[in-house]
Structure formats: C-alpha cells, structure tokens
Amino acid sequence: MFFYKIIYFIGFPYIVLRLIVSIILPIASLYFIYCNFIAPKLREKPESSYKNKVVIITGASSGIGAELAKKYARLGCKVTIVARRLDQLEKVKSSFLKDYSRVNDDDILVIKGDLTLIDDCKNMVEKVIEKWSKIDICVWNAGSGSLIEFSKLQGDISIYRDNMELNYFSLVNCTHLVYKYLEQSHGSIIVISSLAGKFGTALRTSYSSSKHAVMGFFNSLRNETKNIQITIVCPGFILTEFHDNLKTLDGKQVERNKGNFMTASQCANEIILAERQGIRELIQTAKGRVGNYLQAIFPELIEFLTHKFASSSVKK
C-alpha cells in the first residue's frame, strides 16, 4: 500500500505536467497568437473611414500630440489641437497648412486651455460641438513629469498634487464631458499613459502614481462601456520636449541619456495603428512588453531591472 502511495505522489505531478505541456500550452499559444496578431488585423479599420471624423488632441503643441494631429489631419479628420501655449499651437497649425495641401484652415481648430481648470475643459468641448456637432476620437496626451527622491521632500508634497491634477484628474474631467458624445458616435479614447503606469520606478513616485491612477481608471471605464473603444498607450522614452522640461525638486534641469529614445513620429504611427486595430493596451518597447509578462512571476527581478534601467536613463 505504501509503495502505491509513493507511485501516486510521483506520478500525479508528472501527469499534470504532461497535461500542461500537451494540451494547455498549445491552446494558450494559439490563443496568444490569435489575440495579438490575427484579431487586430481582422478588426483594423480602413484609413478611408477616418475622413471627416472629429478628433480632439490635448498636449498638441509639440511632441507626440503634434505628430498625432498632423497624421490625423492627413487622414482627412477634423482636428482640434489643445494646449496652454497658443503661439505654439498656431505654429503647429501653420505647418499642417504648409505641408498638406488637402488640409484646409477650417479643418483645424485651435484652443488654448489649461486642462486642470474645469472651465477650460468645458470650453474645449463646447467649441468642438459648436463647430462640428460631434466627437469621434479623443487623445488625452497632456501631462507632466518630475524626478524626486521621496526622502528629500522636506514636508512639501505639492508636486504630487500638481502631477495628479494634470495627469489624472484633468483626464477624468475631460472624459466625463465628452462621454455622451463618444457613446453616440461609438468613438474612441486614446490615453497616453507611460511604462511608469505599469511598473513602480525609482525617483518617479509622483509621476508613476499618477500614471497608475490613469491605468486603473481607464481599465475600469472600459468595463463599463460597450460603445467606446479605449486604447491605453505606454510609451517608453520619446524624443520630445517632455524630457527637455523635466526638472528635479529644486528646479534643476534633468539631463537624459537619449541614445535609445523613439522619435515622436514613430510613436504616433504606432498609436494610430493601435486605435485602428482596437488594441486595448499598447506597450511601445520590447523591454516593457517582456517586463509586463514577467512581472507577476518574477516581481523582485523586474523591480531590480526597472531600478537599474531608470537610474541609467539619468546622467549623473
């Protein structure tokens, strides 16, 4: 009897392992391939379907926002560009009209706005509806960052409130205001989050916490709505003014190693394709994608690697 018990305890794990290898792994692999490579192609909307769609892009005065605006304008969309710097927005609009002969002055709406102010958010939506009577795509791109060593805050956590106001609460406010219009048009929201919203990262407790809040809100909202597509984008390091404007707590400019940064144009191309294919979440770096899969299995390893990578991205 004892001998049979030994055989059972040795044999049962072996049977389970055989079951996993021979049945579960092949099914899981096929499902992974279908979800990540086949289904997006089947869902992909043709470029021609974007003609006359109404698009709002925040943080559009430079970088990713400006590149997205240009590319949506080329697709024939009616584009609203929003930012705090009116002069820079006008330059972006002028570049549209100069570079793309098919884009007319009336196709681009420029709105100056501080999205941490609810009145500016309301004004943005009212002007878009007044001009075009609908909203099809919203790109929430405005944001700010900071590098802070938590132990050196000296009692002042205002930078945390500032980051949350722009990176999180402004997105919630704007989404609330456009929600009914997007439901009517079966529209899309593109949220520019960050890898800092996927991984806790050294020196980025303020920025990372705001981006984790963004991820939580829009993943939850996706479960509430059937008529609005939500695509969350997690870029890596992009060659934009965002990094040029990044400062430490004492106001000093942060020097970055930009050798492996992605261009804003390449980033924008991937974002537009992800929305066309109905992608739920776009992680734009290979390291980020691998880390996302491994985080649940090897959390200590991922913490070590993110700390090393984050520290190496800042010049000493």
Swiss-Prot record:
Transmembrane residue ranges: 19-39
Topological domain ranges for the Cytoplasmic compartment: 1-18
UniProt: NAD(+) binding residues: 56-80
PROSITE patterns for this protein: ADH_SHORT
Record protein name field: Dehydrogenase/reductase SDR family protein 7-like
Coiled-coil intervals, chain numbering: none
Annotated GO MF terms: oxidoreductase activity
EC number(s) from the headed UniProt entry: 1.1.-.-
Gene3D superfamilies the record matches: NAD(P)-binding Rossmann-like Domain (3.40.50.720)
Family: Belongs to the short-chain dehydrogenases/reductases (SDR) family.
Cellular component annotations (GO), alphabetically ordered: cytosol; peroxisomal membrane
Subcellular location per the Swiss-Prot or TrEMBL entry: Peroxisome membrane
Keywords: Membrane, NAD, NADP, Oxidoreductase, Peroxisome, Signal-anchor, Transmembrane, Transmembrane helix
